Amino acid sequence: MGYAMRLALIDGEHYPDVNRWALEKLKVDCAVFVGGMEKIGSIRDVERTLSIKLYYDEDIFKALERAIEENEIREVIDLSDEPVLTPEIRFRIASFLLKRGITYIGADFEFKPKEWIKIDVPSINIIGTGKRIGKTAIGGFVGRTLKEEYKVVIVTMGRGGPESPEVIRGDLMEITPEFLVEVSEKGRHAASDHFEDALTAGVATVGCRRCGGGLAGFTFLDVLQKGIEVAKSLNPEIIVFEGSGASFANVLSEGFITVVSALQGKEIKMYLYPLRISLGDLIVVTMADEVKDPGKISSLIKEINPDADIHLTRFSPRLIGNVEGKAVVVTTSTNSAKRVTKELEDRGIDVVGFSGNLANRVKLREELKKVSYDTLIVELKAGAVDVAIKSALRSGKRIVFLDYEPKNIDDKDLRESVKELARRIVNDKGHRKGR
């Protein structure tokens, strides 16, 4: 790597002499003109005043792209101001630069990217725009879809994950309720994502720990690097990295899948969500059946990432096991419990009660005591193992795990798109502009 260059963003709301004065003091190598004409006659006036190369375009992101391609930029200094650069545009700029590993500095802010990790095994990175949007369900779906053609390992990084990377051989063993209770009684979080993925995908998983998440989605602390080495020791043909909440693995994978909830609406244009959107080769919009016009969120996504393959989906309950007799449904929210109950009843299952309090152990215990049932249908989340499953086993109840299968509502085929992404990655390493 050569000399690390510094670029400045300047505008026409400042007099050209003021811009030149600031650029000389900060020892800037080149600049991008971002708009504003109040203090200048034309952009030529600015060019004549400056002693460095100036880039400009009606689309400031095209100008930035060109400057970055022609120079080894490692730092961008924002010398503009409102009204030229609004907070929304500045967050878009931050997203644009962080994706490329470039630091973005303003008068009272600094966005510094975590270093992207490159690995020598083909990989897909699944990232999300928040918690409870169905990211783990998508991770399991991707895992079981790809295992039809490849040896797959899923690497997770949860807030309840193990300090040392932990392997669960979902490809070699059955994940039973008894096994999970045994894990829980040893003081481990048996509902962590790597257990859930091993259960729902039937592949080997590596569970890692992370703590803290930044605005862009990078973690403060994690054991991901060790997890990568453990995953590679399993000799996978493809590794799937699965994010945690709105945070994600800082691995520069050949393919990215971004998971967005349709319920988030315009929120995805705010702050640094555009970074996550811009990374996606595939963008899976979950819960699209719960909004009146899911096409609106597709339009928002296209504004940020016009090249993405967008899939509008709904979740359909996928039961792992057979239901017998009267059933009770236990999930992480009352709304999801109601939706699942209705769909299962439509399938002929006799649901006599439900709870959406997996994340509230006290309420969950109280609710389960009030209902008489034969089969517990439960998500592997939060208090599932140490409360719901343990109680059901003590009472001799049958336990069926509840997963969610994404179903397209837009006449597209998510399964085939996931396979096609993997084929591109495995066959040609998925290289593309911006990676």
From Swiss-Prot:
Assigned GO CC terms: cytoplasm
Q: What is its main location?
A: cytoplasm
Protein keywords = ATP-binding, Cytoplasm, Ligase, Nucleotide-binding
Q: Where in or outside the cell?
A: Cytoplasm
The keyword Ligase is assigned to this record: yes
Q: Which GO terms describe its molecular function?
A: ATP binding; cyclic 2,3-diphosphoglycerate synthetase activity; ligase activity
Some GO term, biological process aspect, for this entry: which one?
gluconeogenesis
InterPro entries, per database record: Cyc_diphosphoglycerate_synth, P-loop_NTPase
Annotated Gene3D superfamilies: P-loop containing nucleotide triphosphate hydrolases
| Enzyme Commission number(s) | 6.5.1.9
Question: Which superkingdom does the taxonomy of this entry point to?
Answer: Archaea
UniProt record similarity statement:
Belongs to the cyclic 2,3-diphosphoglycerate synthetase family.
Role played: Catalyzes the formation of cyclic 2,3-diphosphoglycerate (cDPG) by formation of an intramolecular phosphoanhydride bond at the expense of ATP.
Its protein name is: Cyclic 2,3-diphosphoglycerate synthetase
Q: Which organism is it from?
A: Pyrococcus horikoshii (strain ATCC 700860 / DSM 12428 / JCM 9974 / NBRC 100139 / OT-3)
Q: What lineage is on file?
A: Archaea, Methanobacteriati, Methanobacteriota, Thermococci, Thermococcales
